[in-house]
Amino acid sequence: DWSDPENPSIDHYSKSKTLAEKAAWDFIEAEGKPFEFTVINPALVIGPSLSNDLGESNKAIQMVATGKMPVAVPLQFGYVDVRDVAAAHILAMQKPASDGERFALAEKDMWYEDVAKVLRENGFNKAPKLSVPVWAAKILANFSPELKMALPYIGRVRSVKYTSKAKDLLGWNPRPAEESIVATANQIKDLGLIK
């Protein structure tokens, strides 16, 4: 499915990604398909970074692991490891069947309370133990810039079907999201960003 760029609740990042992809497909069509074209749309990309720059997605894991987010808010995202995104790109280049296809990638959708539980089970004891309902999270968003950005997504159940197409056409086999979450938190800890 495509994001609706005219929807007033869509954030600028998602809108720009949607418009850029549509422009690319329009170009391919207008030019008579001058080359192979495949689109890979990963969900929230987490996992070990090659540098000390965590990136925005890994900062979400940091917020939960450090307790900066003192309660788990009702946010659900698809999670995919950066190493699995790289593998999907390589597979797409190797498999002719990927031409003209769009692949939405995530290993699974998880609520923040589930992410917090995974982190606590792996020694990150500052991860929140309590969850708040949607109405409370929307009130809290007035006091937190990070939550305010996520306001359109609070309480929203994801309905994207991610992996089956990539698994079937590419032979893509992502690692469990839980493994990626822990690897991310461990790297952040090793960088001294989790005490």
Where are these regions (language model features)?
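Mid/C-terminal beta-alpha module of Rossmann-like enzyme folds, strongest
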Residues: 88-149, 177-195
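Active-site Tyr-X1-5-Lys
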Residues: 2-38
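Conserved sequence/active-site signature of Rossmann-fold short-chain dehydrogenase/reductase
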Residues: 45-47, 85
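Conserved SDR Rossmann-fold cofactor-binding beta-strand/turn motif
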Residues: 41-42
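Glycine/proline-rich active-site loop of Rossmann-fold NAD(P)-dependent oxidoreductases
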Residues: 31-35, 47-60, 92-102
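Conserved C-terminal active-site "lid" loop/helix of NAD(P)H-dependent oxidoreductases
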Residues: 140-171
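Residue-level signal for the nucleotide or nucleotide-sugar donor/cofactor binding architecture
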Residues: 16, 77-83, 110, 175
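A conserved pocket-lining segment of Rossmann-fold NAD(P)-dependent short-chain dehydrogenase/reductase
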Residues: 4-9, 51-52, 58-80, 84
